[in-house]
A protein has these predicted regions:
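Extracytosolic ligand-binding ectodomains
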Residues: 2-6, 11-21, 33-441
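Sec-dependent signal peptide hydrophobic core
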Residues: 20-28
Length: 441
């Protein structure tokens, strides 16, 4: 790339910020006062010897369908940031985290991302559970060249057709879980399946992956029932299931919806008939539901009682930092956010700069040991799709708990090499480095 092209790329983010600032001010979105953006704030730092803080925007739900998971992933990111700040920050700069509620709504996610980048000058964005929200945030992030860590949303499209050079996906996706969970369930559950699907991008693409595994192994999907988000009364769907009498029900339902579904299935004693397979079960969605409601087989990426080095210390650190929490022990959502944030900050340190392209190149292809991540297999970031390939666990309710919170029984684990989403590799077309705006925070 020529010097002229480099200059153009490095200034493109500043130009976008300026244009965005003028547009927002003109529209009156921040009131009648002129919009000064981050420059007014940074002017004060320029007058002192102290380095300005490194701002990280936490784009996590505090309301809506995934509020509980949003709260847990926020704690995970905050813990990783605290550990770095306790050691002096990163590159001699204290890390400042700002949070805005993305409300489990794509439009809100987009507005939050725009505001954090253009007004708060966030160097990085972290967080998402709802895949539609993650996609919306990532489009804004790519426009500015801002690195965005999708910590917990798991539609296969996130590292597939909706991938971006600046986006890194840290959770297992629907295809990974389907390959690990459904294939095994086919051996004991029978041929006729019904799919119960949350009617949005994650649900659709997760059930698509589940259907592919079922049919590839000689099974048949006799019906797919689409469930609108924020459904609380599942009686019509459960009546339909009673009429169909499938061998197995595969659910791609999440957040508060899966809590309501589980409770109503138990009330009708329908968990005692067909086999229930939940593609992925996030810890905040079942914590505190009670023994009967945690039926079936499901996937996860981490559990607080894995017999691995570092796990007990990790749990103790959570309880010390966040005493009195309703969720007394960390789960997969917290673990994903912590690991993502920690690796990002490690990459900044290794790069010796916050320059986005340099940090992106440190993240791409990054390998992380099983010991370091407290899992059974090494993990890595696929340089083609930017998804973290990690251990996938199959679990069920633990009928012999060692303590009150010990509600999962880990049945098996899958090596990430065995459950990779091969379709994502073909669907993902990352933007070039040259087409990605360059900046140094």
């Amino acid at each position: 790339m020529s010097d002229t092209e480099k200059s153009s790329a490095s200034t493109s983010r500043r130009s976008l910020l300026k244009q965005s600032a003028l547009a927002l001010a003109g529209a009156g979105l921040y009131g009648a006062a002129p919009f000064y953006g981050p420059w007014k704030h940074n002017h004060a730092w320029a007058q002192t010897a102290q380095k300005k803080p490194l701002v990280i925007g936490l784009t996590m739900d505090a309301s809506g369908q995934y509020a509980a998971s949003g709260g847990e992933e926020r704690l995970g990111a905050v813990m990783a940031i605290k550990e770095f700040n306790d050691k002096g920050g990163v590159l001699g700069r204290r890390i400042e985290a700002i949070h805005m509620d993305t409300e489990t709504t794509p439009a809100t996610g987009s507005r939050v991302a725009e505001r954090m980048i253009s007004r708060n000058e966030a160097a990085f964005l972290i967080g998402a559970v709802h895949s539609g929200v993650s996609n919306a945030i990532s489009q804004v992030a790519q426009k500015y060249g801002t690195i965005f860590l999708n910590t917990n949303s798991s539609s296969p499209t996130e590292a597939g057709k909706d991938c971006h050079r600046t986006k890194f996906v840290w959770d297992g996706n629907g295809s990974n879980f389907s390959q690990a969970i459904v294939r095994n369930a086919m051996k004991t559950s029978g041929r006729n399946w019904v799919l119960l699907t949350n009617d949005y991008v994650w649900g659709h693409n997760t059930s698509k992956a589940t259907r592919a595994v079922i049919e590839a192994n000689g099974g048949r999907v006799v019906e797919e029932l689409l469930v609108p988000q924020n459904t609380r009364d599942f009686s019509a769907y459960l009546l339909k299931l009673q009429q169909i009498k499938p061998n197995a029900v595969a659910t791609a339902v999440g957040g508060d919806d899966i809590k309501a579904l589980r409770q109503q299935v138990v009330q009708l004693k329908m968990h005692q008939g067909a086999a229930w397979i939940n593609n992925q079960q996030d810890w905040p969605d079942v914590y505190g539901l009670g023994q009967d409601a945690i039926f079936g087989v499901f996937g996860t990426t981490w559990y607080y009682r894995l017999d691995l080095p570092g796990v007990k210390e990790f749990v103790a650190a959570y309880q010390k930092q966040f005493p009195g929490m309703a969720i007394r022990v960390p789960g997969n959502v917290y673990h994903n956010a912590y690991m993502a944030t920690r690796e990002l900050l490690r990459c900044v340190e290794e790069a010796g700069t916050t320059q986005n392209i340099a940090v992106i190149k440190k993240l791409e292809g990054r390998r992380m040991t099983a010991l370091d991540r407290m899992q059974h297999h090494d993990a890595w970031i696929d340089p083609v799709t930017h998804q973290c390939q990690q251990t996938i666990y199959m679990a069920s309710y633990n009928d012999k708990p060692a303590e009150k919170d010990d509600i999962f029984k880990i049945l098996s684990q899958a090596d990430p090499r065995e459950v990779m989403d091969k379709e994502a590799t073909g669907a993902c077309k990352l933007e070039s480095y040259e087409a990605t705006p360059s900046y140094e925070a």
